[in-house]
From Swiss-Prot:
Subcellular localization, as worded in the UniProt entry: Plastid, Chloroplast
Protein name: Uncharacterized protein ycf68
Family indicated by similarity: Belongs to the ycf68 family.
InterPro entries (alphabetical): Uncharacterised_Ycf68
Keyword line: Chloroplast, Plastid
Organism field: Zea mays
Taxonomic superkingdom: Eukaryota
Main location: plastid
One GO cellular component, as annotated: chloroplast
Pfam families: DUF2647
Amino acid sequence: MAYSSCLNRSLKPNKLLLRRIDGAIQVRSHVDRTFYSLVGSGRSGGGPPGLLSSRESIHPLSVYGELSLEHRLRFVLNGKMEHLTTHLHRPRTTRSPLSFWGDGGIVPFEPFFHAFPGGLEKAVINRTSLILPS
């Protein structure tokens, strides 16, 4: 996509305005070349940029579609399931109860503790079944 750059005196000296052919404006930083912010929404025809007003809203699904797969998964799982490394690095007292699925969710394991009077260390726990020592 082609860009035309222009300087804007109202911006700080470390910023650069880039206008795309479709009319959108991006603000880029001279300090961090990876940083940019989209100021206007592009329109076909190359007319003047359509700036976002306070009344105009952006639908969340359009933003969701621009996210990477990793961010989508984090977005979907946020609040419903924790990342396994977060679960494992938390202190043991704050972890979720054990379950058959091993992730601290779905089927709690605590009701079955009474079946092992000698403790769970004497039983080998498999994800699909419990194997009692003979």
